[in-house]
């Protein structure tokens, strides 16, 4: 696993980090003179957990927040753990025939990636796989959007997605790619065993090579006039169909 220091800003993101990932929080910055009770709560909790807290001016917070609205608070801490590709095999084995792996083929918008991770954590996935290149990374925006989910599930960054898919298949993981033109419905396939759900990025969807490595393609039936869903919405729909089947098994 690898980690690097980064800044997280915003009340909810910092509060979640202090509550759920205190061991990795290096320090908390709070706007001097603020009377916001939420900031007081964050400061008190951080101090209880032994985290350094500094009161700073707005300019200092602007400097670490960049273009993201900081709401008077920021935290410096080790980024979410990124699991190595060779650790994925052990995660699948530990699931004992019921692995649920989410594979995201080039989701570039950090807000979408964060929303996908949040759904993945809620669904209890075994791991989320993302490419190291041509994909959003688990940065401050992703962590804020994920509401702490990036800390709770293994996110595996891989150099070669096609090779990773082949390795999953060797472990008995059946790969279903989501594609609007597919003939089979998501609701017609068995998602109860070792399953990998593969979704493409914004715009182009699954890349050709990724499609070729899927064992089957499925679609979400949409009787309305809209032909596609946002990738984070499609991820939630797909994951929770798997959850529904598994809970009913």
UniProtKB/Swiss-Prot annotation:
Subcellular compartments: Cytoplasm
Gene Ontology CC annotations of this record: cytosol
Primary location recorded for the protein, binned into one broad class: cytoplasm
Catalysed reactions listed for this entry: guanosine(2251) in 23S rRNA + S-adenosyl-L-methionine = 2'-O-methylguanosine(2251) in 23S rRNA + S-adenosyl-L-homocysteine + H(+)
GO molecular function: RNA binding; rRNA (guanosine-2'-O-)-methyltransferase activity
Gene3D superfamilies in alphabetical order: 3.30.1330.30, 3.40.1280.10
Binding site for S-adenosyl-L-methionine: 200, 220, 229
Signal peptide start-end: none
Record's keyword annotation contains Cytoplasm: yes
EC number: 2.1.1.185
Keyword field contains rRNA processing: yes
EC top class named in words: transferase
Membrane-spanning segments: none
CDD domains: SpoU-like_RlmB
A Pfam family this chain is assigned to: SpoU_sub_bind
Record keywords, A-Z: Cytoplasm, Methyltransferase, rRNA processing, S-adenosyl-L-methionine, Transferase
Alphabetized InterPro entries for the sequence: 23S_rRNA_MeTrfase_RlmB (IPR024915), Alpha/beta_knot_MTases (IPR029028), Ribosomal_eL30-like_sf (IPR029064), rRNA_MeTrfase_TrmH (IPR004441), SpoU_MeTrfase (IPR001537), SpoU_subst-bd (IPR013123), tRNA_m1G_MTases_N (IPR029026)
PANTHER family tied to this protein: 23S RRNA (GUANOSINE-2'-O-)-METHYLTRANSFERASE RLMB
Role description: Specifically methylates the ribose of guanosine 2251 in 23S rRNA.
UniProt family annotation: Belongs to the class IV-like SAM-binding methyltransferase superfamily. RNA methyltransferase TrmH family. RlmB subfamily.
The protein's name: 23S rRNA (guanosine-2'-O-)-methyltransferase RlmB
Species of origin: Xanthomonas campestris pv. campestris (strain ATCC 33913 / DSM 3586 / NCPPB 528 / LMG 568 / P 25)
């Amino acid at each position: 696993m690898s980690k690097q220091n980064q800044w997280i800003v915003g009340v909810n993101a910092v509060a979640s980090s202090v509550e759920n990932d205190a061991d990795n929080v290096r320090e908390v910055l709070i706007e001097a003179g603020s009377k916001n009770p939420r900031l007081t709560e964050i400061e008190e909790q951080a101090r209880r957990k032994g985290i350094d807290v500094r009161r700073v001016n707005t300019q200092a917070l602007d400097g670490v927040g960049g273009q993201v609205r900081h709401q008077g608070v920021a935290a410096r801490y080790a980024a979410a753990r990124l699991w190595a590709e060779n650790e994925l095999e052990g995660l699948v084995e530990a699931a004992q025939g019921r692995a649920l792996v989410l594979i995201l083929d080039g989701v570039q918008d950090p807000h979408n990636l964060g929303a996908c991770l949040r759904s993945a954590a809620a669904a209890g996935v075994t791991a989320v796989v993302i490419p190291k290149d041509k994909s959003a990374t688990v940065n401050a925006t992703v962590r804020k959007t994920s509401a702490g989910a990036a800390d709770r599930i293994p996110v595996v960054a891989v150099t070669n997605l096609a090779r990773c898919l082949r390795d999953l298949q060797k472990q008995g993981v059946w790969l279903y790619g989501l594609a609007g033109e597919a003939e089979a419905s998501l609701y017609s396939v068995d998602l109860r065993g070792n399953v990998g759900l593969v979704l493409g990025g914004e715009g182009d969807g699954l890349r050709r090579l990724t499609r070729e490595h899927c064992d089957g393609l499925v679609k979400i039936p949409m009787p309305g006039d809209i032909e596609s869903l946002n990738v984070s919405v499609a991820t939630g729909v797909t994951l929770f169909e798997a959850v529904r089947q598994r809970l009913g098994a």
